[in-house]
Amino acid sequence: MIPFLDLKPAADAADVHAAINRVIARGWFVLGPELETFETEFAAACQAPHAVGVGTGTDALALALRGLGVGPGDEVITAPLSAAYSALAIMMIGARPVFADIDPDRLTLDAAAAAAAVTSRTKAIMPVHLYGQPADMPAIMAVADRHNLLVVEDCCQAHLATCAGRPVGSFGAAAAYSFYPTKNLGALGDGGAITTGDANLAAHLKRLRNGGQTDRYHHAEFGVNSRLDEIQAAVLRARLRWLPRWTSERRALSAEYRRRLKGAPVTVPAEHDPGHVYHLFPILSPERAALQAHLKARGVETLIHYPVPITRQPALAPERPADCPVADRICADVLSLPLHPGLTRQAVEEVAAALDAFHAPA
C-alpha cells in the first residue's frame, strides 16, 4: 500500500521528542519562551518583520482581517476552490465572502475575475496559495491598488513558497499560515500564525489572540482565546529546521511525477513559478471516480481536494451561488496523488505505472 500521507515523526523524531521534553521539564505551557522564539524564527523564515502565533490557520485568517479593520457589512473577495475554512474565517468576523473564479492553469484566484467582483462594499481580497502554488500576486496587487483594497494572503498551504522572486505573504498587509498536521510545516495538533510588516498590527493581534488583554485580567477590547501553545511551538521550532529539506524533497518528487506523467491522458496543472512548494500534487481526469477506484485496487491511496466548491456549500454560500464554472469543473475532475517527505521515487514510479495501467488499451 502506498499511503497518501505519513504523519509519524521520522527523520525529525529525535528533535520532536527533545522539544516536547524540554517544555514538560520547564513546566510553562502557554504564552512562554517557546512561542516567543518560534515567532522570531518563523518570521525570519518567511522574511517577514513580525509573526504572531495563534490557535489555528482559520483563526489566523479571521484575526488578520479583523486586525486590519474588516468586519460586518464588508465584502472580501476570495477563491471558490479551497478548504472551506477560508470562507469561514471571513464569516467569523461578520464580513461576507464574495467568490471570484479561478485561473484554469494556476487553479488560484483569477485577477480579472477578482476585479469584476469589486463593489462599493469590497474591503479586501484574500487570495489562496492553493496546493503550494502561488497565486498571481503582481496581478492581484494591481487590482487591489487600483481599488484601494486590503490584501490578506492565505498561505496555509504555501510555507516557504515564492512568487516572482518574493516570499508569499510579503505582498499584502498580512498573511495567514496553518500548522495543521498535514501541512508542509505541521504541528502535532492545531496551530497557526500571522505574518506582517506592521509592528502596530502585530501588537494588536497579540492582544486579540489573548482575550483583548493589555495586562493580566485587564481586557481593553473584545478578543478571543486563540494561542499557539508551548508544546506546539517547540515542535514547530524543531520542524522548521527540517522545512527547507522537506520542501526540496517535495519539489524533487513532483518533478519526477511530472516527468513520468508527461503524455499521460491526465492533466497536470502547470507550474507557473519555481517557488511552488507542492503541498499537494493534483491531477485532473474526467474519469476521476473510476481512476480513483482503480488506484485503490492497485494499492495507491488518493484523496480529493476538493470535491465541492465553496460556492456549492449551503452553510457557506447561502445566497445564490456565484458563477464559477472553472472551479466547478476542477472540483469534478481533481484527484491528489501521494506526496510527502519520505515518499520514495520507487513509489512515484508505482503510482505512475498504476495510472498507465488504467489508460492502457484493453
For each of these PLM feature ranges, what is it?
Residues 28-75, 86-93, 99-101, 166:
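Phosphate-binding glycine-rich loop
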Residues 1-28, 33, 338:
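N-terminal "arm"/small-domain region of PLP-dependent enzymes with the aminotransferase-like
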Residues 153-188, 215-220:
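Conserved active-site segment immediately N-terminal to the catalytic lysine
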Residues 66-155, 162:
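PLP-dependent aminotransferase-like
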